[in-house]
């Protein structure tokens, strides 16, 4: 059960939160009621019952399913507010930072709301509350946090994200334009915000570091670019003075920040952030988890070297509808995978992001993912292929993909894991073909590094219908010879490469040995 000092601290913190969200600070819907964002109250009720059974909340409990479900449900709404407010032109790394902040906010909000549930276990007389009374209080806490507060937080997330995106655009133009603060200019505008209306200053002015909208819950103010000289520039010190004056109260002062410059949706001084350091660390680690395909796409896009993996951009990662495949791609940045492999890709990417070790199954799924990424590096793009041409293409693609797996892992700041997949990946139907090709390289004495470089260059730059040519030429130009040292002819290598597709490994080895021994 919560201690007396703990209860006193959180009662005070709860009062601070309630003061921050008091009605006069919220501009509610026209009917005076906050809209329902579809938060699933059953999730909160299950978590509340779990808290009752555990006798309270500790930071470590945030990692357990009941609390995680509340965090995820909160983030579903607040994260959706962020993603729906930003255009596709916004760099993925910036979008990722904003969504990360919304997740952390969701986690700390959950910790605070569940702590209030824990406090409600004890009545004013110091005894355990009756079951019915406890659940009445839970319903009130749910309505307060997951409807009333959530309404203000959702609107704030929308405006903050929009202003962050605008700020990114403003930065591209520098001081070529001035920025002008504008209210909605109607009867609902707050008097203090009206005082900021039409303030016009360069983008580099310190005013924008503190008073970029939103400047309060449900603030509808915006900032727009205007041509220099069209409007008189405001006095910077006077503008800052007005901003400081209208946000002098502590509960208003928390909005003194620039979401675009700080790349945060919610201000650091929000009372939720007064959670224990242990809770903050756990939530920060949870925020690194990649739980959805959309998050995986953005994570891959965060770095320029990873964006270069896609000739036509990385757009979607989805569950495949095709049967009998591990994955597929249209080579236009859309990758499909089986549900099982996709889930393992997400968990594997999470571990790589956190510097952890991936499992054998995750490494296998990541190898499939890398195979499909490698397809997207082909410059000419998809085209109709005969069955034989497609087999040559898949041989070349899987050969390059598995031999360059270290590049994939190194892009996340780590070393190659499960290197066995560079030589043998039995989950793919192309495994025998590739192992035969690697055997051919060894038996002919061709330089494996030169072969890889040549096949890779041909795979990325030439039409898929011509990949047989690349596979043959790579071995020819890398010193391939017969057993007696006689250089192999192109026609001989063609026959041997075709054999990679026709025979099992043992039969292929015998076939190559016989072919290389012939004079």
Can you name each region flagged by the protein language model?
Residues 1-142, 227-358, 362, 450-454, ...:
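N-terminal leader/targeting and assembly helices and adjacent pre-domain segments
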Residues 123, 131-175:
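Internal glycine-rich, Lys/Arg-flanked active-site/core loops of soluble domains
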Residues 150, 362, 366, 389, ...:
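Hydrophobic (often cysteine-bearing) scaffold residues that line and stabilize catalytic clefts
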Residues 157-231, 372-380:
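Conserved short secondary-structure elements within globular domains
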Residues 237-247, 420-441:
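Short secondary-structure subsegments characteristic of cysteine-rich extracellular domains
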Residues 363-383, 398, 402:
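Active-site recognition of the HExxH zinc-binding catalytic motif
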Residues 387-433:
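Post-HExxH zinc-binding segment in Zn-dependent metallohydrolases
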Residues 453-461:
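Non-catalytic terminal regions with compositionally biased, polar/charged low complexity
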